[in-house]
Design a protein with these regions (language model features):
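Phosphate-sensing "switch" segment of ASCE/P-loop ATPases
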Residues: 142, 163-176, 181-319
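Terminal-proximal interaction/regulatory segments of ATP-powered molecular machines
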Residues: 314-383
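Charged, alpha-helix-enriched surfaces in structured cytosolic catalytic cores
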Residues: 3, 17-21, 67, 71, ...
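Charged, amphipathic alpha-helical linker segments immediately N-terminal to NTP-binding catalytic cores
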Residues: 1-28
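Active-site-adjacent bridging/hinge elements
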Residues: 1-7, 48-49, 244-255
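Conserved ASCE/P-loop NTPase catalytic core
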Residues: 30-207, 358, 364-369
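Short, hydrophobic/amphipathic alpha-helical patches that form generic packing surfaces
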Residues: 21-38, 274-281, 359
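Long, charge-rich low-complexity segments
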Residues: 72-99, 310-342
Length: 383
């Protein structure tokens, strides 16, 4: 019998949804972590440093405008025809959400303070997809954490949310798992908030752009197999039931050997542990004493996450420009700028990034020596 991951893969393939090899492992892992976290909050069987561990894996996808951010989240979470839409996993999908809308607030009604908890309360046991969460994005793109709302941070960390306002105190517990996204930006992953998300960085190569065009066309008129949808339903029901049997969770030495080999910073290890935990839960039989082990598949998933986090740490926008130059060595500057318009970047933004990359010695620039009046510049990646 196929496991949950294999069945979800088949569900996506039947519906002609592209690049599932890149994205599906992370979202399935996060979904399994969500279920096991709810169970751990009920029975408290897995502890870290004397506290019941929070096992949620929040996800954040960064991609240019029009390149699958909303599409991916909707196919997992939105309405009954999504992957998890009719399963034991509670899901919701929202468009634009403010910080107050997520955390909540207190308002004065007829002279009395009335609590108005936000989505973190309303969907406390859901996986919530948010198309545009400006407060979250603004916090992670800030050079410092001074603008960080502590209530937002704790909602995604321990789940114990306390927000003190002039009208009173807002206090509740949430176990919501958040999946969000934005356009490429300079994210500060060393901040408390950035460390709590697994990142997917998707700036399609020229080949992938052609594949996207093909996937879009192939998906016309495709409903997908009801039998596969039923299998996803039954497997999530079984997983939720089997999770109730778990009495302890341990991590094999191979997990830490793998993390040491990748030189993962200690403050990012919990993220990689959760990826491995979720993937093991989705692919292995559930036992009362469940051991998380390293596999070739997990090594590949970890490597993807490591590469994406490096690109984001070093500048997601710079990485986007570099990708085009690496694909087309010697590309003329104005040709590059024109291409990047379709990726949400203005001529001025691209010019500034080219100058930055040149100063960092990541690219070389050759001026057109044949026509001095043309002022053409050709860009090359530095080895």
């Amino acid at each position: 019998m196929a496991n949950l991951y294999e069945t979800a893969n088949r569900w996506m393939t039947e519906r002609k949804i592209g690049f599932i090899d890149l994205m599906l492992p992370f979202y399935i892992s996060a979904a399994c972590c969500h279920i096991i976290n709810l169970e751990n909050k009920k029975r408290e069987f897995y502890f870290e440093h004397g506290q019941p561990a929070d096992m949620r894996l929040h996800m954040f996808i960064t991609a240019p405008p029009g390149y699958m951010k909303s599409f991916v989240l909707k196919r997992f979470l939105d309405r009954q025809n999504s992957l998890f839409g009719q399963t034991a996993i509670k899901t919701a999908f929202m468009g634009q959400v403010t910080e107050a809308g997520f955390v909540g607030t207190i308002q004065s009604v007829d002279g009395e303070s009335v609590q108005q908890p936000g989505m973190a309360y309303d969907f406390m046991d859901h996986i919530l997809g948010i198309e545009e969460f400006s407060a979250l994005t603004n916090t992670m793109t800030s050079d410092h954490s001074k603008n960080l709302d502590n209530a937002l941070l704790t909602a995604l960390d321990s789940g114990y949310l306390i927000k003190r306002l002039a009208a009173g105190e807002l206090r509740y517990e949430t176990h919501l798992t958040l999946w969000a996204g934005s356009q490429p930006a300079r994210f500060n992953l060393s901040s408390g908030l950035g460390r709590r998300f697994g990142f997917i960085y998707f700036v399609p190569t020229a080949k992938q752009q052609l594949q996207m065009r093909q996937f879009r066309r192939e998906g016309k008129g495709i409903m997908g197999s009801k039998a596969t949808a039923d299998s996803v339903y039954h497997l999530t029901e079984k997983f939720t039931s089997d999770a109730q049997k778990i009495k302890e969770i341990s991590f094999a030495d191979s997990i830490y050997t793998g993390l040491d080999a990748m030189e993962v910073p200690h403050y990012e290890e919990p993220l990689y542990e959760k990826i491995a935990l979720g993937y093991n839960l989705a692919t292995q039989p559930i036992t009362p004493s469940f051991t998380v082990r390293l596999s070739d598949a997990i090594k590949r998933i970890w490597q993807l996450e490591n590469e994406w986090r490096f690109k984001i740490k070093s500048g997601a926008l710079e990485s986007q420009v570099m990708q085009f130059i690496i694909e087309s060595p010697g590309i003329e500057e104005n040709v590059l700028k024109t291409k990047l318009i379709d990726f949400g970047m203005s001529f001025a933004e691209t010019s500034a990034l080219i100058d930055t990359l040149y100063k960092q010695r990541r690219i070389g620039i050759i001026n057109d020596s044949k026509d001095k009046h043309a002022r053409k510049r050709y860009l090359w990646p530095m080895s």
